[in-house]
Amino acid sequence: MRLVVVAAALTGFLATPAFVSTQTQPAPSASLAPPPDAPPPHPVAPGPYAVSVISEPTLTTHTVYRPTDLSPFTAGQRLPIVAWGNGACSNAGLLFETFLTHIAGHGFLVIASGPKDAPLPAFASRVPGQARSQPDPNAGIAAGSTKDEDLIKAIDWAIAENGKSGSAYAGRLDPQKVAVMGQSCGGLQATAVAGDPRIKTVVIWNSGVFNEPNGGRGATLSGARKESLAKFHAPVAYFLGGPTDLAYANGKNDFSRLTTVPAFLGSIHSGHGGTYMHPGGGWFGEVGVAWLKWRLNGDQSAAKYFEGADCILCTDPIWEVAKKKIK
C-alpha cells in the first residue's frame, strides 16, 4: 500500500515502501553499489539541447555544463543557474557527468565544484549498475576537496558573467532563478549555504546533517549543522536512496525539522549511489529536472510530479513520498 504523508511536522514518519521486502534489510551503507533488490534502471530521454561540458578560463576551479548553443536564451527565456556540490566533497567536476549533462540538456546552466581535468576519485565509475565502493564519508575532507563556499563562488561567477559585456553569457542567464544542489557531502554543502537570499530552491540528494550533537562527524565535512535548517527560506526537496542509503535517516530527520518552507521528500530503493550513472541519470535525472522546471520556471506540467494526492511520484509504488506545504 502506498503512503503519502502531508504534515507540518513529522518525526518517525514514512512507512516501508511497497517495493522493499519485509525481511531484514541490509544495514545502511556508504557503498555506491545498488541494493540487490533495487528497481531496474529507468532510462531517461535527453533534453532538447545539446550540451557542452567546459572549463571556463575565469572559473577553472569548477566545471560548467550548459547548452552548446546559447543563442536561444535571451530575454524571456534565460538560463536558470544551478550550483552543484559533489559527493564525498570530491574536487572532480566530471564525477556526476551523466546526471548533470541531463540537467543541462533541459535548459539549465549547471556549475559543478571541481576542475574538469581533475582525476575521478578511485570509487567512481561511469558504468551503470557496476558495484562501486566509496571511502568513509565521515573521514574528513582530504586536501584539495571542495568546500561550502565553492557553491557561492559558482553563483557569484554566473551572475557576474551575465552582466559582463563581451561574455558569452551576457544577458543569457537569469539571476532570479538560482538553485543549489548536492549529493551526500555536497548535500551538506548545499544545506550550509541555503540561507543565501539569491537561492530560490534547494535540492538535497542522498544527504542529511549528522544527528550527533554539534554535527558530530559531519562537522569535518561541511559547516552544515541542524541549526542551518532554520535558514532555509526557499522550497526544498530531499531525494534519498531508501533504508540502505547511509543518509536515509539523516535526510528524513532534516525533513522532519522543516516547518516554514514547502518541502518534498522522495525516496527510491537505490542505496547511497542513487541512479546518477544510469542513462540520463535515471529516476534522479527525471525528478531533478522536474523539480527545477517547476520551482525555477513555474512549469505546471513538471509540478504534476509533486503536487496533489495523485502526483506522479505519489502514485508510483517504487517511490516513498512525504510533503509539507505542498498540496
Model-predicted regions and their roles:
Residues 270-273, 278-327:
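Alpha/beta-hydrolase-fold serine-hydrolase catalytic core, especially in secreted/extracellular enzymes
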Residues 5-17:
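Bacterial N-terminal signal peptides
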Residues 17-25:
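Signal peptide processing junction and immediate N-terminal pro/mature segment
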Residues 200-278:
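The feature captures the conserved acid-bearing segment of alpha/beta-hydrolase catalytic domains
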Residues 154-231:
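Primarily recognizes the serine-hydrolase "nucleophile elbow" in alpha/beta-hydrolase
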Residues 55-173:
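Serine-hydrolase catalytic machinery in alpha/beta-hydrolase-like enzymes
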Residues 25-77:
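N-terminal cap/lid segment of alpha/beta-hydrolase-fold proteins
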Residues 77-81, 106-111, 175-177, 197-202, ...:
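Loop/turn elements at helix/coil->beta-strand transitions in domains of secreted/extracellular proteins
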